Amino acid sequence: MRGFIGGLVMGLVIGVVLAVTAPGSKISSSPGNAGQPVAKLANSNNIEKPVKWKLASAFPSEMPLSGSLGLTMIDRLKEISSGKIEVEFHEPGALVPTLDLFEAVASGTVDAGLASSQFWGEKSAAFELFGAVPFGPDIASHLAWFRHHGGQKLYEELYHRNNIHSLICGVTGAAGAGWFDHPIKELKDLKDLKIAATGLAARVYRYIGATTVNLAPADILAALKKKQVDGVAFSTPAADEFLKLNEYAKHYYFPGWFQQAGFIDLMINLTKWEGLSKSQQKTIETACMANMDYSLAAGEAGQFDALKNIVIRGVDVKKFPPKITLALKRAWLKVARTRASANKDFRRVLNSLKNFREDYSIWQELGKI
């Protein structure tokens, strides 16, 4: 570590000297946001027309954060735009089946959707890396990578290929590892189970021998009640409590190996996005930024109360034995290598995030207690 830092400092000094003394060297006068991804904007001289959109949500409106953020965003938009941007919230399945939401937004069948990109792994493997990353970064570093180190550019490229413009419109923190109807003491206890899971969590659970089922959030409790699944890997304690998973599974495990941070996406039909004025686009971006700020604080603030309620209801809350967590990490590394070898987009996103985390870890080791 010290040797590395010494070399890093020396390299920076030499680089600065060479840059200053090189012939024709110039100091860039580019604005601070140069190089940042900029969405294709409509002609700002266009006459603004009132916007009235329908939004289909993958999450129930009463679900803490994941769902309620949709209503919060809609209220913000109406207030900021003085009523000129109106979005009508529709509960999961009301307009289209939740797992068909991607196609519905891409085609313009619905104007916008609220979901997690981990649902869209069959569209592109790389989408799953924006939803939840196994053994991944916390919220702060995940946002740092996304906003300032290439993540947003890759994210927008993926969505734009599919005629969707997407904005991060909320964040979630660490998830639980899973709910099960019996204790999990050994890795073999996970094998042959049927687990409701999506994204990369599902791929890792399948790698170790479990079977997974991709369910819309609103369908998870019914599947658990009918014993169609033996376990559930979903989200944060607050969201899990809302689904009432404790009624049919009494063993809740941590840590959240498959999600330390998650993004909630506002997907907008790209043609309709480009038809907005620059001012209207900025209004939507501003509302989503405010949503992110709110969800970051409120999400962390609400988790202990949710855990307390879960324990009161008789759930056994504990951590996986370290050997299980280690086995899951090894499985993830193998899954990641396989996915990266098979898919260029997955490889680009994974390498971008990996390179950032390697550099960021030096700052973490030096600066954080």
Regions found by a protein language model. Name each.
Residues 2-142, 159-369:
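N-terminal secretory/targeting leader peptides
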Residues 140-156:
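A gly/proline- and charged-residue-enriched helix-loop-helix capping module
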